[in-house]
């Protein structure tokens, strides 16, 4: 007997209902498994998406699901008495797109930035990317966490 399973998954698709609806779920499946490497236990999480708005939704989707991964790892740790660390997060999307109504904004802001900024520069105003320990990133994650908490309350 082991304290983990290979069967831990959540499926959002309802075959008898979703093919006929105008708004079927974009997130189709979440699969989790505890893996052991170098005598440490990690929670691996894979998600499979039917469709994803790359410009307006993907960031919060990734934030929310990696927060869920942390929560699940903590719950398993508490229930088993074994330390479970957050492991790899693998995100698979079949249709990753930008809606036409957002393309002008995407072109004017995002693509323009690609031509005018370095991939990484310590000066944030000259950089396309930031480190995850940057105060602005930490503040952004905290803001996202608050949005999720407020959404849960409503």
Report residues per predicted region:
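Active-site helix-to-loop segments that bind/position phosphate- or nucleotide-bearing substrates
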Residues: 1-65, 70-154
